[in-house]
Amino acid sequence: QKIQDPRFTSVEVDAGDLVALEGLIKKVNPDVVINAVDPRFVMQIFTAAQNTGVNYIDMAMSLSKAHPTDPFHKTGVMLGDEQFAQAEAWEKNEKYALIGIGIEPGMSDIFARYAQDYLFSEIDAVTILDGSNLTVDGYDFAPSFSIWTTIEECLNAPLLWDNGKWHTSEPFSGGVVFDFPEGIGPVECVDVEHEEVVLIPKKVKANHVSFKYGLGADFINTLKTIHALGLSKKEKVNYRGMEIAPRDFLASLLPDPAKIGPLMHGKTCAGAHVKGLDKEGKPYACYIYNVVDNQWSMDNYGDQAVVWQTAINPVIAMELIANGTWKPRGVVGPEWMEPKPFLDLIEQYGSSWHIRDEDPAGLAL
């Protein structure tokens, strides 16, 4: 029904076919290409926009490649490296590629930039914390986001920023139990690979940056089992004459995250825990966050909470670019932009953001 809305037209295209993508972009001649596709196809769509001279927005960045000999200590190709490598070409063409403007990355990065500009004189640590109490009727294991992407970011070596350098660690390390707001409560969180750890240090001066995902013990154990059985592999294997990637097969067995909204209950939270010195030089810590209730998003938009929470951010970004408030140029992340106009619009779009004071001696390490 949404696709049949007269304000929109739809067309089928292979997101992995660069020539087909370029042909479609030339035919439509848009002001901006918005990439909401699986991150495996980021570089094809990004390159197609670049080759056709069209602005670009995405909500997840180009994939990483592990260090060949020491993957749990040293970085290889980091998230977004392939995109940032083209920054000079985008600037020369006087076009923008605003990358990582979903909820995480995206709103979370804007929270970090806001903290630097308005709340802190010195930042020791920024810890992005994502957690929920979402349940899905009839399923013991039903990720609210792409299982392909969930496996990618949780089983890859977590990326960390410490004292001016990026490094990696073992999957599921750095565990803490964080008490999420608005009734979500305590959730076990672990370090994972995520774009914020690449983006935030480029524009926010902090000694430490990490991303901790509130998976919970059961989800973590399930992912460990998936990995132990080899079902997390994205390389194709031959099974009785058929070529199939175990991860793709696993994804086909699980419910589509876009269709489980009516079965979902609970809330999801995304935010930045920031610790340092406030503008008066006193120790201070806070959690800047956004919570979406699944019942609210289903009632008002017909979309489940995680989908809606992600999708609203590029819409706000496009409005700010269209009215001239934001003027991106080249390859940039959310931190490059003034945060307050974005946060003001969150309220106008029916959502909200909040600041909860935290113990300056706790977390964010």
What are these regions (language model features)?
Residues D117-L365:
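C-terminal catalytic/substrate-binding lobe primarily of soluble NAD(P)-dependent oxidoreductases
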Residues K2-F8:
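Short, conserved SAM-binding/catalytic segment
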Residues E12-N29, V37, F41:
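Conserved Rossmann-fold cofactor-binding substructure of NAD(P)-dependent oxidoreductases
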Residues I25, D31-A36, A49, Y56-D58:
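N-terminal Rossmann-like NAD(P) cofactor-binding module of classical short-chain dehydrogenase/reductase
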Residues E82-N133:
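Adenosine-phosphate binding glycine-rich loop
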Residues A60-K95:
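Rossmann-fold NAD(P)-binding glycine/threonine-rich loop
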